[in-house]
């Protein structure tokens, strides 16, 4: 799923820099974020009222971009001006009315299309706001909730969880969930985010260590239930999946660790459920060591 991000005008106002972050560091983060968007085929937009934002005290952004005297007074280097110009100029234009509607919808949390806001200064974590690669990941996961089609969901997952490799049969396993995907998707995304952000780095650091210790951390920090199978021999029979290795050869992998989808966490749905996400910590010869997501669906 491709997304569209719009530069947020008031995030370029100097008073928004509550943490006094260095200009160069902010530009590096924003430039890297934009490059990720471009490389993935996403769209970025600019509303031209942005040029009137008070980027420095009493000085509009357009003066900073195009007037060397104002650049000097603001203490902005030539390299920083080039970076700032690149961030602002290399976007499609969006009209005032459309910009205002999108920003209002996002602030009101009434997002129905894959739009979000690309910010310069971003002090607090806000839904659908990003200014770094990490906050962009959060935005992608928030927008993933708009997806109800299983194939679209699976196709979008690698962009939202870059540390994970997904089995090609996931669309079929998702059909076996004990509740409709539309009800379950928030909880599934929460579990995948925990495996991507918490479990995968732990496993990469200590592949030869105890998997149980990694699962304990995943359980505590991810606030979810997870474990190995009780019978290892039975697990080998039931939980062996094939993944393509780096030689494009199918390789069997036992995906015994699993998180427990014990409920949809939807209001009014109190039913205890037995769905699972089965995975493997990863092998260097398969998808460059990403954690392998083998099954999202019913208990196997």
Label each residue range with its predicted role.
Residues 1, 112-118, 124, 133, ...:
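Generic structural motif recognizing short loop/turn segments at the entrances and edges of beta-strands
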Residues 46-49, 140-141, 175, 185, ...:
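Arginine residue identity/basic-tract feature
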Residues 67, 73-84, 181-185, 245-248, ...:
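Short, structured coil/loop segments at alpha-helix boundaries
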């Amino acid at each position: 799923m491709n997304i569209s991000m719009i530069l947020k005008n008031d995030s370029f106002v100097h008073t928004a820099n509550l943490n006094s972050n260095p200009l160069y560091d902010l530009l590096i983060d924003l430039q890297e974020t934009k490059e990720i968007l471009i490389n993935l085929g996403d769209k970025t937009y600019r509303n031209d009222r942005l040029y009137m934002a008070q980027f420095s005290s009493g000085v509009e952004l357009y003066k900073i971009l195009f007037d060397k005297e104002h650049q000097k007074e603001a203490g902005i280097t030539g390299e920083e001006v080039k970076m700032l110009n690149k961030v602002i100029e290399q976007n499609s234009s969006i009209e005032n009315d459309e910009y205002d509607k999108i920003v209002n919808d996002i602030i009101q949390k009434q997002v129905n299309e894959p739009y979000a806001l690309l910010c310069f200064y971003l002090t607090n974590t806000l839904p659908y706001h990003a200014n770094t690669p990490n906050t962009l990941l959060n935005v992608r996961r928030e927008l993933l909730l708009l997806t109800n089609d299983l194939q679209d969901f699976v196709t979008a997952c690698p962009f939202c969880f870059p540390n994970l490799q997904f089995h090609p049969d996931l669309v079929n396993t998702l059909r076996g969930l004990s509740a409709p995907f539309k009800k379950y998707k928030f909880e599934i995304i929460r579990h995948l985010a925990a495996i991507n952000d918490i479990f995968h780095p732990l496993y990469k650091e200590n592949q030869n260590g105890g998997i149980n210790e990694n699962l304990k951390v995943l359980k505590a920090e991810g606030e979810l239930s997870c474990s190995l199978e009780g019978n290892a021999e039975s697990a080998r029979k039931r939980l062996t999946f094939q993944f393509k290795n780096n030689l494009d050869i199918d390789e069997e992998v036992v995906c015994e660790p699993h998180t427990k989808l014990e409920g949809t966490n939807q209001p009014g749905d109190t039913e205890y459920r037995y769905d699972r996400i089965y995975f493997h910590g990863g092998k260097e010869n398969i998808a460059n060591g990403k954690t392998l997501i083998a099954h999202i669906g019913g208990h196997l």
